[in-house]
Amino acid sequence: MEEFHHLSVLAREVMEQLAPRPGGTYLDGTLGGGGHSELILEKIGPDGLLIGIDRDPAALAAASERLRRFGSCFRPLQGSFGDLAELLKQEGINTLDGLLLDLGVSSHQLDTDERGFSFRLDGPLDMRMDRSCGDSAADLLQDCSAGELEQIIKEFGEERWAKKIALRIVQTRQETPITTTLQLADLVAGTIPRRFHEERIHPATRTFQALRIAVNQELEQVEQGIRAGIAALKAGGRIAVISFHSLEDRIVKHLFREAATGCTCPPRMPYCVCNKKPQLRILTGRPVIAGPEETDRNPRARSAKLRAAEKLG
């Protein structure tokens, strides 16, 4: 089995917000290495159930091995948390006591060259969470027009140099396909004027983020998964979501606020006709972030933001 390493971010804070109860049914929609799931399983005890979902077969296998001691209390499923509603239906589960989504790419995926996520390691430009299906990042770079590439890099990477990078990609691929991570990283670094290179951020960071989001349809998955998760929660059940960049965090914040809002009728209406009731109580007015001790131990935790909410009756 492929060795899988990953440090669970905000583990203590997640447990405080999720507050798992003995005998409850919980779902970890982004299983990863199984660190968060292990903590939940320890709390819910032998009468509880934790369902772990992941698109990555390597993550699923590693977590299943790590959590084997919990026996039938742990149920691993390969799939995307965006398909959460269908996966729960297949398993015959109607309601949940709690749900966790950790939206970050795992340390293992970033540090494994053949996965193609890292601009620091040379490997095939893949970036698929599930390598058995879908187009790779290299496919996108080869097939998309300059305009489409600009839109992807600008929208998903919030990159100010998106147009220039997209044009350079199209010019380069006419001579040679862009198929490796370092090939793309060098291209982006050479396109952005050196005086605009940031000290602590590699110049290709935003472009790689944008391609990864596009390849895996991450933002669509986030919205679908959160909406389905809220619908599946019991009254008093909780949802906790860890995001790692502003695009994800904005979606989480918006969906939580939307679900926590009641009547949306105009003030001039004499009575409510929308019949909208608040579904959630937001538990985190501001996102919870990692403290200095955790960020010293795991620098990738610096950008993590945790938001949580509780389902109303």
Curated annotation (Swiss-Prot):
It comes from the Bacteria. One of its GO terms (cellular component) is cytoplasm. Keywords: Cytoplasm, Methyltransferase, rRNA processing, S-adenosyl-L-methionine, Transferase. S-adenosyl-L-methionine binds at residues 34-36, 54, 81, 102, 109. Its EC number is 2.1.1.199. Its main location: cytoplasm. One of its GO terms (biological process) is rRNA base methylation. Specifically methylates the N4 position of cytidine in position 1402 (C1402) of 16S rRNA. This is Ribosomal RNA small subunit methyltransferase H.
